[in-house]
């Protein structure tokens, strides 16, 4: 079958350059075949390079024979007029495996070679002077407060300071007896011996770092590596203080449960601990663990993504203006409480990711990292000097990723969260700001490759992200690392070894924009199935995506959730099950289910939902602030709405649970098979296959179709596996579930095109049908193909592995008899377990030879 590809004439804002298919027509259906994992992309933009690699500044490491592994090593940047050393010839083209996947990147080979060389050189320098990257990323064992040989040792990098001392409750905030010494790398240190075998600084006591400016002014700052910071809750807008956290063994939390296995496809529940209470107050880590985690598990999510964990002095920043990078947010509890939460999640089989903000830092001076910037140059600061060090839209500071101590600080920060708290991975926030020197400000990315690989690329930041992903996966190979990038930079989600940046997943950020646009600006009759489907499939298929219809971004004040866009004020009065649903509520609930399921099923290789949106939480999020009289009323989750038996919120919650259960059962998100067979703008119907499931969506506001035939790839018998119109999901029960549907061959002779009679497809409804596997003359097929049954199964389910198993052969030998489902029901286990036990015998003794023989011979005509 001929496959034609095209580039969207008007790329979606923020969308990924993609392999965008054109439909090729057949006699009985249209079928879209997406490129396989090893397919290449299309050419975007000009082939000419418009950048000069020699303009990128490089870093030089100051060498000294007295350098020791335990000492701090400071990187000194050259000025912006410095030139880059010539590229060495040993960086070969074949080392950039990314170009083999996408040959249209070939014109940018020099760029990839340059950044790969920078990455290799930086890593080699670290290993030369500090040891392996994993040891370099243990800076928290040296910097900040640590116990060493009967002493408390405190170290701080502050090369521009003139004099330093440590102050706190332990010395009455008078540091004259605790002055610090500075080494040649700008690291200040002090050793405070124990007195009577007890630490001089008590556990849970306040501490700060006091230093003198070059102009003679003394200032107090929270230590950069502090592990806990608190503010006086009895005072309004009280400043934060660092806290020395070293609990005795009896007060430490000890993890009891191992990390759960990495899921084949993450189904992520994005959550904010503080606003997770049903009451208008700040919730705690332990309350979240005991009350909210069971809800997440009950809805069959396998991953929790926690926002706002790193300490941030301004609650309303949603946690994205971090002040203390190694400290847990004290609003919700202390470090041991967070460990309890993570351990509880692991006991439920849930992975836990943390939002990590390394793209910028809070502009706060008294309680943030910005307080260490006293006007010095980039060589002596965590941030770029001058205008380059400020993000004018976010009002925040920007890291200098070429600085040695910045690399130590940020890489150590990642290892700290992984090892101290047992997190299972990260979501890197706002990395578009990191990838480009313009930070994405006033940029509308169109997909032209010149936008990604030019002098606008911040290679220092790219190298840091490559180092970060290399480190994370070395420490914890099963970590899940997700990138939030609106630009769609190619290679972001490919391994570092291929020349990529190394993330496991990227967020599909264009999808929610499309839904919001449709809900705000288009009537139901004007929805384009082709346009919506293109938005969901417009991605690089060699890089995995996390799809979502809405996240916390769509929930904040000034915006509206999908449920609120659909039902608005009727959510206050029309959600009772004791009265008939109004047309607005009926439409709203139906489309809420369809939009989220459509996004999940077709939009990526993982799925994300923000806390409360699964049941259509009304209204918006508004953190306490002066403008709302510091109210917490809109900064909570009303779980009682989903729990109430007489409110319609329960229907959306039940459907969300069923969506996730479906992937748990069939693993369609992890399937490489994705075929869109129909995008009917007139009838408002979309039909596609994911794995061995057939999805049918009818977005028409009125039309119900009788005897509607849809295309499918596999012949045989199908039955309904999920129906959004079912009574238990608040629907009208217009589709029967007790009827099996058999395919019938249609189309061009010799081409195995099949259809099954969909009988009825109600309006505003989505149906999912599963293929009922039948055990046929599989042995005969294997004998004719001269392959083993195991080879046949592998080649069939993970196509294409064996080219001998052609589609025609599969169709011919899978005209089947006894249903696998019936067999599983008799044996009382899942189909996957049956396949494993049947084809790799003997694994389960319950599957006896007699039973297998009876199944194989029970052939129905």
Curated annotation (Swiss-Prot):
It is found in: Plastid, Chloroplast; Plastid, Amyloplast. This is 1,4-alpha-glucan-branching enzyme. It catalyses: Transfers a segment of a (1->4)-alpha-D-glucan chain to a primary hydroxy group in a similar glucan chain. The record marks 553 as: Transition state stabilizer. Pathway: Glycan biosynthesis; starch biosynthesis. Keywords: Amyloplast, Chloroplast, Glycosyltransferase, Plastid, Starch biosynthesis, Transferase. Gene3D superfamilies: Glycosidases, Golgi alpha-mannosidase II, Immunoglobulins. SMART domains: Aamy. Its EC number is 2.4.1.18. The active site is at residues 429, 484. Belongs to the glycosyl hydrolase 13 family. GlgB subfamily. GO terms for cellular component: amyloplast; chloroplast; cytoplasm. Catalyzes the formation of the alpha-1,6-glucosidic linkages in starch by scission of a 1,4-alpha-linked oligosaccharide from growing alpha-1,4-glucan chains and the subsequent attachment of the oligosaccharide to the alpha-1,6 position. GO terms for biological process: carbohydrate metabolic process; glycogen biosynthetic process; starch biosynthetic process. It comes from the Eukaryota. GO terms for molecular function: 1,4-alpha-glucan branching enzyme activity; cation binding; hydrolase activity, hydrolyzing O-glycosyl compounds. Monomer. (1,4-alpha-D-glucosyl)n binds at residues 173, 208. It comes from Solanum tuberosum. Pfam families: Alpha-amylase, Alpha-amylase_C, CBM_48.
